[in-house]
Each structure stands twice: as structure tokens, then as C-alpha cells.
């Protein structure tokens, strides 16, 4: 069993995408956020909700994200970021800093299934396909062996 599969996210019951990003005020985070805004209709059509977790205060998120009417859920939960091991200590010129690493996860039945440490179109596509496979796994298993091949194809 993978390390991430042991982490339970009880608040998320459906198959969904969980994204951890740094503060909403950073330029790099805004770039990632824009990428998810582009992917939002695709996830919405598939019925896969996207949860983005920020370390910011809820008021800060509410002010910023009230302009977007998307399928993205904005969450302020620093404890979850710690549980997912997304905080890294860096030393710059002898001074310690905490940096939040951007990561994406597929959540299925309350457990993490897949982790992606890079956020780009290719990585989002990979997790989108994995989420679709998990969401429709029972349908695929049921119909995989029951499909009849027409005699013309023999």
C-alpha cells in the first residue's frame, strides 16, 4: 500500500481532484489557479469536483474567489496541508522558511489514490483520466466482458 493511500479525507465522498496550492496572493499560485479555471468545465461535465486547498484565511479566499462561478471548491485548511506532507523547510542565507509544495491528488471513496507533484496540462490530464477510471470502474468491469463482438469482425 502506498503512503498516500493510508491518508483518509472523510469530508470528500465522491471521486474528485484535490489540489494543494500556496497562498492565493503569489503569482505562481495564480498561474496554477488559471490553469484549473480552464480545466473546470471538463471536470464539471464528468461530474468530478475540484477542491483547491490554500493556507490562507477563509476571508481572504472569499474576497478573491467570489468572482468565479466555477465547479472549483476553495478550502482553507492548513492542517490538511500538513497531513498531506506538503510543507518543506528551506534555509536561505541561514534563515529558515516554510514553503508549501503544490501537489494534486485523486480522491476516491474518501482515500487518496494518485499523487502528482507537478502541475501542468499533461499532469492534470493524467489525473483526469485516473479519476474517470475510478469513478466508472464498476461500469467498466460490468460491461467489459459482456460486449458481444459482431460476426462481421471475425
Predicted regions and their residues:
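Non-globular targeting/processing and membrane-anchoring segments
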Residues: 1-32, 41-49, 62-69, 99-100, ...
Amino acid at each position: 500500500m502506498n503512503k498516500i493511500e493510508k491518508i483518509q479525507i472523510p469530508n470528500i465522498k465522491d471521486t474528485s481532484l484535490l489540489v494543494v496550492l500556496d497562498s492565493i496572493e503569489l503569482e505562481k499560485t495564480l498561474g496554477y489557479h488559471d490553469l484549473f479555471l480552464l480545466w473546470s468545465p471538463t471536470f464539471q461535465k464528468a461530474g468530478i469536483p475540484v477542491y483547491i486547498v490554500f493556507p490562507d484565511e477563509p476571508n481572504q479566499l472569499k474576497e478573491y474567489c467570489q468572482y468565479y462561478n466555477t465547479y472549483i471548491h476553495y478550502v482553507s485548511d492548513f492542517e490538511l496541508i500538513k497531513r498531506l506532507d506538503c510543507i518543506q523547510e528551506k534555509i536561505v542565507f541561514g534563515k529558515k522558511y516554510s514553503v508549501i509544495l503544490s501537489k494534486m491528488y485523486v480522491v476516491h471513496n474518501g482515500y487518496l489514490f494518485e499523487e502528482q507533484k507537478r502541475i501542468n496540462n499533461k499532469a492534470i490530464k493524467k489525473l483526469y483520466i485516473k479519476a474517470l477510471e475510478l469513478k466508472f470502474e464498476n461500469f467498466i468491469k460490468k460491461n467489459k466482458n459482456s460486449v458481444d463482438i459482431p460476426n462481421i469482425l471475425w
